[in-house]
Amino acid sequence: MSAQKMTNEQILKYVQSKQIRKDIPEFRSGDTIIVHNKIIENNKSRIQKFEGVVIRRRGSGLSETIIVRKESSGIGVERIFQLHSPQIEKIEVIRLGKVRRAYLTYLRERSGKSARIKERRPAKAVEKTSKPASAKKPAAKANKK
């Protein structure tokens, strides 16, 4: 027996850390993304793009999933993707959406203009401008009478 024994939880964390993807961009519900999905048919493989709005992002670790919705010929199409699946080649974030819900079920009843989501502007990086101690303003001169 080995000197150090791993618990089941430690083994699970170790295996998951090897399989988890690091190249997933930051996005959330309401954002428009393109998922490049690898499809294998017979001996050929090809990449299929699926562009739509993220309706839900759920779970953590290897079991994290997203639901992406798009309208195709007036019919709503939703697809569930496992984020850390090897079938996903890459994910591109096209537009940042401004929503106040984590699960956008109300988009299912809407189509066209009413299904639009406002755009969220990315936060600007605020530069900290600190003046050095020697750059202080000189003290005001005292009034002479």
From Swiss-Prot:
GO terms for cellular component: cytosolic large ribosomal subunit. The keyword Cytoplasm does not apply. GO terms for molecular function: structural constituent of ribosome. This is Large ribosomal subunit protein bL19. Keywords: Ribonucleoprotein, Ribosomal protein. The keyword Ribonucleoprotein applies. Belongs to the bacterial ribosomal protein bL19 family. This protein is located at the 30S-50S ribosomal subunit interface and may play a role in the structure and function of the aminoacyl-tRNA binding site. It comes from the Bacteria. Residues 112-145 are annotated as: Disordered. Residues 112-130 have a biased composition (Basic and acidic residues). It comes from Malacoplasma penetrans (strain HF-2) (Mycoplasma penetrans). GO terms for biological process: translation. PANTHER family: LARGE RIBOSOMAL SUBUNIT PROTEIN BL19M (PTHR15680:SF9), RIBOSOMAL PROTEIN L19 (PTHR15680). InterPro entries: Ribosomal_bL19, Ribosomal_bL19_CS, Ribosomal_bL19_sf, Translation_prot_SH3-like_sf. Pfam families: Ribosomal_L19.
